[in-house]
């Protein structure tokens, strides 16, 4: 079966996976061994650490393999990082609807993202294998991203209640549950019965939302590169920083009113790039500049709007 060329050697794959496991072990076993409310300053520090590690890794790829793989990693990381911001909007709604205390939100996100890492790996390798065998799928992915981008723009102001969704209704019918919390536990025992707590319901919704967002983000990175190592590492670095980014931005998501417009434009651009990939070759630096420009413009426009908009304590989002 045909395969795509990759800069990743067995040693690099093993080293990167070992690094991810070590960082996750430090996160849960040392820094978050005891449940606590993650404050903005702590989240900012972790976010800066994850971004710095990603940039150092990208610089290493550039130095070792040349500017093209380096730019592909940075572009893929930027795409995944920007699309994951939309995930934060959903996480805020989930935690608010299920009334998950801030004390336990990190635990839910940790286990949700841990399972997301395994799921992303499966989806990435499946996608690479399918594209290697069926090149025409690149056009299908491109069309899907264009449609998704247009849909995101048209539904940018729509708010869904996760408690009324099909997944939550199915979970409550099939999994015995209780509305009561039992500390940080996903299950508890009431009257001799083992029941799921709201933390498990939140975890299921977090995992489901990540599956939906992965359907957008993974095809989008294939527009940048089909190198499995670059696709995997850029995706995983972005996911590892998602929890800290959530705690940093959760209280300010409503200020980014034009961000979904920027994300929809990115999806349409990336989808178009995939659709014309066999006819127009776009250099990695052009893709990176366009994506960064679209996101930057949407963020600046959002900040200008929020600065001139009246605010009140009553309007502040509750997490």
Curated annotation (Swiss-Prot):
Choose one Gene Ontology CC annotation of this protein and give it: plasma membrane
Check the record and name the InterPro entries matching this protein.
Answer: Integral_membrane_TerC (IPR005496), Integral_membrane_TerC_rswitch (IPR022369)
- Membrane-traversing stretches: 11-31, 43-63, 83-103, 108-128, 134-154, 195-215, 220-240, 260-280, 284-304
Q: What is this protein called?
A: Uncharacterized membrane protein STKORF319
For this UniProt record, give its keywords in alphabetical order, as a comma-separated list.
Answer: Cell membrane, Membrane, Transmembrane, Transmembrane helix
List the membrane topology term(s): Multi-pass membrane protein
Taxonomic superkingdom: Bacteria
- Would I find Cell membrane among this entry's keywords? yes
The question of whether ATP-binding is a record keyword is answered with no
* Stated family: Belongs to the TerC family.
Q: Which NCBIfam families match?
A: R_switched_Alx
Give its localization.
Cell membrane
């Amino acid at each position: 079966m045909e395969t795509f060329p990759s800069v990743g050697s067995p040693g690099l794959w093993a080293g990167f996976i070992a690094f991810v496991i070590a960082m996750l072990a430090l996160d849960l076993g040392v820094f978050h061994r005891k449940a606590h409310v993650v404050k903005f300053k702590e989240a900012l520090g972790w976010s800066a650490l994850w971004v710095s590690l990603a940039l150092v890794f990208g610089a290493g790829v550039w130095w070792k393999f040349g500017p093209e793989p380096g730019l592909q990693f940075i572009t893929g990381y930027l795409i995944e990082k920007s699309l994951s911001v939309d995930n934060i909007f959903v996480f805020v709604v989930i935690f608010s609807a299920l009334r998950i205390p801030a004390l336990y939100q990190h635990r839910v996100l940790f286990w949700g993202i841990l399972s997301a890492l395994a799921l992303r790996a499966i989806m990435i390798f499946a996608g690479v294998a399918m594209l290697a065998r069926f090149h025409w799928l690149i056009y299908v992915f491109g069309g899907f991203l264009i449609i998704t981008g247009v849909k995101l723009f048209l539904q940018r102001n729509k708010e869904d209640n996760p408690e009324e969704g099909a997944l939550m209704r199915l979970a409550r019918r099939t999994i015995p549950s209780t509305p009561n919390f039992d500390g940080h536990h996903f299950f508890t025992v009431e009257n001799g019965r083992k029941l799921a707590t709201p933390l498990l319901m939140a975890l299921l919704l977090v995992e489901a939302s990540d599956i939906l967002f992965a359907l957008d983000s993974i095809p989008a990175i294939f527009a940048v590169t089909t190198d499995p190592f670059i696709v995997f590492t850029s995706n995983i670095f972005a996911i590892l920083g998602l929890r800290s980014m959530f705690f940093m931005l959760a209280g300010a998501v409503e200020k980014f009113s034009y961000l979904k417009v920027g994300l929809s434009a990115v999806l349409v651009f990336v989808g178009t790039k995939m659709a014309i990939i066999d006819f127009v070759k776009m250099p990695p630096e052009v893709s990176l500049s366009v994506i960064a420009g679209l996101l930057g413009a949407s963020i600046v426009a959002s900040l200008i709007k929020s600065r001139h908009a009246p605010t009140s304590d009553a309007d502040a989002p509750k997490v």
